[in-house]
Amino acid sequence: MAKVLFSSFQQTGISGSLKSGQLSGVFINGTNLKSNAHAKRFRKNSTSSITIRCCASNSPTLENTKLAGAPEKRQKKKQLPYQGILHVPGDRVEELDTRETSLLVAEVKGWLMKLASGKGEISPSAYDTAWVARIASESDSSLPEFPEALEWIINSQLPDGSWGDDRHLQLYDRVLSTLSCLVTLKTWDIGHNSIAQGTKFLRENMIKLKQDDGDLLSGFEVTFPMMLHEAKQLGLDIPYETEFTRLLEISTKKKLAKIPLDKLHSAPTTLLYSLEGLQDLEIDWQKILKLQSKDGSFLSSPSSTACVYLKTKDRKSLQYLQNAMEDQNYAVPCHYPIDLFESLWVVDTIERLGIDVFFRDEIKAVLDYVYSFWTNEGIGWGSTCLVNDIDDTAMAFRILRMHGYNVSPDAFNQFWLPGDKFCCFVGELSHGVSEMLNLHRASQVDFPNEAILTKTFKYSHDYLLNVDSAHMDKWATKKNLMGEVAFELANPFHDCLPRIYNNAYIKHYGMDDLWIAKTIYRLPLVNNKVFLELANRYAQQCQLYQPAELTKLVNWWHSSRFEDIPSTRLTANIDMLPYIYYVICATFHEQEFAQLRVFFSKACCLNTLFDDLMDCATSIEELDRLQNVIERWDISLSHELPLEYRIPFQEFYNTVLVMTEAASKIHKNLSPEFICKYLSGIYTKLIKSEIADARWKIEGYIPSFEEYMENAEVSISTWVHVLMSILFCGEPLTEEILNTIYDSRPLKLDRIICRLCNDIQTYKIEMKLGQPTQGVSCYMKEHPGATEEDALVYLQSLLEKTKRELNESYFITHENDLPKNIKRFNFEMVRMMLITYNETRQVDLFRNPDNELKDMIKFCLETYRTL
């Protein structure tokens, strides 16, 4: 039914103070946004609400239409229980400086083009730079090969005597980095003052180290003990015997004992990343060279590669280190390169913040680069990395699939271990929350018959549901990772609208997030102030046009005189207008889709109202008369209809004329006559299907499930909003496209999904309201002995299957495919429906709104000022 989508948003609380006549304005805390839309700024954090107000005047009549016999105005309705709940921020947005936005966009475009060429930015690692600085010159062993690295070490010591990230004190990182720098300085016998300050820091802080609380650095159990051993040999005055070091020694011995040397020498594993910590093992360093990446590194680790060079004097290893030093301004990071990881996370961040509208071409270039390294076994963090991981593979799989690249979920098979467990790397002992979150997100873009993604979804979902809120992630220190997890679990991919998702992530996004490897590091192109400022600016920009568009819709409602319809069960009223409007704003938010938003909102109102009327129908004779008028599509026959049918038909008719005029200006290749026939045909098809529904109800007829679905797929009406709105979605259209689009596979899947999710959630309520014809009852009639639960299981399985088919239809480009924005609108129409009838909701949101849905709509209205 038409109301299934829009009615739920009717409950979110924007109040309407309405009288018949000319619209006076849309008010926030008494300020008229119609006359003062962008000039006023309200107090920040004030609790303002929207009121729609009209001044008294004679009600305008419909053009070319005279409504005879209209009843007197009804008494003002008492306020509905859901009114007055939703508030918009008191801090009104002003016109934005587009020059500043343009500068931000230009800066980010520069970053993306750098990533597309394999370049990026990562913070230097004192630990790794110190390892590289140990290397002696080939021509004179008394001199360093990289004197600039030694100079950087001395100049980068922090005021407290330590080395490491200067904006965040992570004790393990500071101690390890400081120890590495001291060993290097002591080896070259330089920087005595720096050594003194560094040893003082270690003496004061090593005793503060505690047993692993889940925040140890990657490989710390092997790298730190080895550094202690070397420091002791050099005579550094630091505490070697502490409770922590004793416990760590026990843990390290156990870990080293489990390492199979044959595997270490024969196949690339994560052990290659920390070879400098494995020097006590009987390693054949010449065999290790066979596991070298093509760039000369060992798993893109400068410190591990430096260790191998010190053992072997391998020229390829040295060349890698020389390249890294030159490229990174003589202070190497803990990963080099990290190009695939960085590129994927930059694109993901841009899309989650909702600013990808500025960077379509640049994102395509970055993803082309990433895709060139995709394999059937997944992907690693760098283009030369020989070990793939589930985190990068999941992120790459999801983003590449959503952008139409051909990627196979078989890449996840290698991460599935005996005992029904997934791992990030082979040999991993514990999970990180962030990797499971990315796996969970990737699992939701599945196609039919992809069993491995069913496994990944269940595994990651169960893990995230049960993870301790105090759990420390292995791979990142983020602003609010558990907040991200909670939001993702509550808002599955198909059940969340774009701007709701974007605005939520604006709250969770951290400009100063840290990443964890052998040391902590930063990715300035992933976490920065520019992204957040641009995201906030765009969120505000999306609000600038809203008052004028909503005002236009309110004026239209009053000119249509819907409130004159005499029906005691009519739930459609002007209060639903803001909710319908903000739903489409949360989806097609771009400024160029202004006409689409307005006409979509009108279509939703009309369909909701007419669906209500069909639910109330009791006369076969009146239905026959209505069908005759609809099929002939003749406004002169509207006087034959009772008032409750006459008013909406006249508005259907007038809306088609208005839309025809607007669409004709856009699609000059299409005649107005063709467009008018196209639009009237849509409404004719819809209304005839709703008449059939009403006829079945009056006659008490329960059809077979197949017969029911054939009509119910039409009466659900969501396809109507798609077919009408595509005229304004910015795509060139032809008569052939418009004549065949209804029968296209995406539209067919849309109709099935929307009907099924409606029936699954509302069948009990509709039975109580005397509407026995719905999917559950038809299935039970066709399968004698089947219970309601049996019917629901069948409908739910059919729904999930069809959602996977919709994913495939949307993300994969097919021959003779629909234009991109049409596919997008169709997909988002389904998401609008699914967010309304989420499987966790067991009520009819048309009559019983819930706080969760209200909160979601608040996201559409909020402007975040976090800078």
Swiss-Prot record:
Cofactor binding note: Binds 3 Mg(2+) ions per subunit.
Amino acids binding Mg(2+) 2: D611, D615
Keywords: Chloroplast, Isomerase, Lyase, Magnesium, Metal-binding, Plastid, Transit peptide
GO terms, biological process: 5alpha,9alpha,10beta-labda-8(20),13-dien-15-yl diphosphate biosynthetic process; 5alpha,9alpha,10beta-labda-8(20),13-dien-15-yl diphosphate catabolic process; diterpenoid biosynthetic process; miltiradiene biosynthetic process
Residue ranges annotated as motif DXDD motif: 389-392
Presence of the UniProt keyword Plastid in the record: yes
Keyword Iron: no
Protein residues bound to substrate: K255, K474
Cofactor(s) required for function per UniProt: Mg(2+)
Primary location: plastid
GO CC annotations on file: chloroplast
Known pathway: Secondary metabolite biosynthesis; terpenoid biosynthesis
Cell compartments where the protein resides: Plastid, Chloroplast
Catalytic activity, EC: 5.5.1.12, 4.2.3.131
Record-listed Mg(2+) 1 binding positions: D611, D615
Binding sites annotated in the UniProt record for Mg(2+) 3: N758, T762, E766
Residues at which Mg(2+) 4 binds: D389, D391
Family: Belongs to the terpene synthase family.
Domain comment (free text): The Asp-Xaa-Asp-Asp (DXDD) and Asp-Asp-Xaa-Xaa-Asp/Glu (DDXXD/E) motifs are important for the catalytic activities, presumably through binding to Mg(2+).
Protein name per UniProt: Bifunctional diterpene synthase, chloroplastic
Species of origin: Selaginella moellendorffii
Origin organism lineage: Eukaryota, Viridiplantae, Streptophyta, Embryophyta, Tracheophyta
